[in-house]
């Protein structure tokens, strides 16, 4: 037996609390570090770049990366669904190295080619999430593990952008003097420099993740086996759940677009609301960390619900509340009841309460409650691929059809739209999957065998 195999066996036998802490930490660190290769470019404004287009240069960069990320999600439907355990770590490392190479290219090519470079940067990164989820899904504690993983991209987005802002200013990120660069880093080199700072931690985190053992027989009995899905199995899944999946995809398209807009232009929005240069150096980290703690507390509670149908209904209730909060928070801000910083924070809480379950928790419970054997990653990537396509459409709409609107004004309008559409589609999908779950007979015994797939 290899050293990795022996360590995996040891991990299988440790106390559940230790195992869950190890698994959650390794996954969190892996995806947290990935964001250092994706989001730092958004910390800069690129206001002095004239590239001869009605679309702002920063908007073009955002769209280019989203297009690459969306294309990656389409590729991930096949790649992540079919990736065997032995290939995952190598794939993760290769994807990140390709993304960093694209950031170096972004720094050295002319402005128009920089747009292409960010497309190439997004192209590998969209598959990282699915590969990490493959290590965590199908376990009795999947809700807890996936809740921690989901908080990684909430926290990391603010942290890596604050690191990028510190590099631009030539100061030490978070006061850690050993991280300071000799001088301010140029705007176009800052993304690559930030990624380089997180490369070694990423490699270490992937190594820890690779040591996780496969789900136990008890995990399989409770959550169904999660084998790779080939083309025929993927088509069978879509045929069986098409009405519900269609409603969820429509909701997710708008939530993804809203989340992306808030995330990519938070620096711009806060400067509009508080005055340029008055935003605290660690403001983004503080906002997103508070949001992440609240979301984690809510999502982790799902671990205590063993009945899959009840858990699924609870997840839809949480998402419904998140969509409602988008509209309520915007109404409070417009009426002067809360300030801009609190509004941005509540928008983050609302969108992530509705958005985070899509990234694993929701589909993991759908698979379990309907007794469909297969990896939830396929369903996640179907939603993701459509979601990022919607994000591109909304970015273009803002610059081409609402150029006079400020970033904060457009965010407020967008929040109202996302709230109304989200409430409608989530209600429809929730009722659909509740009926599907009610029609499934949960096995009365736990023996590790795979029960009926209920094929149509």
Task: Give residue ranges: language-model regions.
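Extracytoplasmic gate region of multi-pass secondary transporters
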Residues: 39, 242-275
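Central cavity-lining transmembrane alpha-helices of secondary-active solute carriers
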Residues: 59-80, 290-298
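Glycine-rich segments within core transmembrane alpha-helices of 12-TM secondary carriers
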Residues: 142-169, 175, 197-201, 380-394
């Amino acid at each position: 037996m290899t050293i990795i195999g022996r360590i995996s066996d040891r991990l299988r036998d440790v106390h559940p609390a230790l195992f869950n802490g190890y698994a959650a930490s390794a996954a969190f660190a892996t995806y947290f570090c990935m964001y250092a290769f994706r989001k730092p470019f958004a910390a800069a404004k690129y206001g002095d770049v004239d590239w001869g287009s009605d679309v702002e240069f920063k908007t073009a960069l955002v769209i280019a990366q989203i297009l690459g990320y969306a294309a990656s999600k389409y590729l991930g439907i096949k790649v992540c669904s079919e990736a065997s355990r032995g290939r995952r770590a190598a794939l993760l490392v290769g994807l990140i190295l390709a993304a960093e190479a694209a950031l170096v290219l972004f720094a050295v090519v002319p402005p128009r080619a920089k747009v292409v470079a960010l497309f190439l940067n997004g192209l590998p990164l969209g598959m990282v999430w699915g590969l990490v989820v493959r290590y965590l899904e199908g376990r009795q504690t999947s809700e807890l593990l996936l809740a921690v993983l989901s908080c990684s991209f909430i926290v990391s987005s603010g942290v890596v952008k604050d690191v990028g802002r510190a590099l631009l200013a030539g100061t030490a990120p978070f006061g850690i003097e050993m991280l300071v660069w000799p001088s301010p880093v140029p705007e176009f080199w800052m993304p690559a420099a930030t990624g380089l700072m997180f490369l070694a931690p990423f490699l270490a985190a992937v190594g820890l993740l690779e040591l996780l053992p496969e789900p136990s027989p008890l995990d399989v009995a409770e959550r169904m086996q999660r084998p790779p899905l080939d083309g025929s199995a993927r088509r069978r899944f879509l045929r069986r759940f098409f009405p519900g999946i269609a409603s969820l995809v429509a909701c997710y398209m708008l939530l993804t677009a809203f989340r992306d807009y808030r995330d990519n232009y938070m620096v711009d929005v806060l400067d509009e609301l508080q005055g340029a240069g008055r935003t605290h150096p660690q403001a983004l980290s503080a906002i997103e960390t508070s949001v992440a703690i609240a979301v984690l507390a809510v999502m982790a509670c799902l671990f205590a619900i063993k009945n899959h149908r009840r858990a699924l209904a609870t997840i839809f209730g949480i998402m419904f509340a998140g969509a409602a909060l988008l509209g309520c928070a915007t109404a409070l801000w417009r009426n002067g009841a809360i300030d801009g910083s609190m509004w941005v924070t509540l928008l983050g809480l609302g969108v992530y309460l509705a958005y985070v379950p899509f990234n694993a928790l929701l589909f993991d419970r759908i698979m379990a409650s309907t007794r469909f054997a297969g990896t939830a990653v396929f369903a996640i990537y179907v939603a993701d691929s459509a979601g990022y396509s919607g994000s591109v459409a909304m970015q273009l709409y803002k610059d081409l059809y609402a150029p006079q609107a400020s970033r904060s004004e457009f965010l407020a309008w967008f929040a109202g739209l996302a709230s109304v559409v989200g409430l409608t589609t989530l209600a429809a999908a929730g009722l659909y999957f509740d009926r599907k779950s009610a029609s499934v007979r949960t096995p009365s015994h736990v023996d590790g065998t795979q029960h009926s797939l209920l094929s149509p």
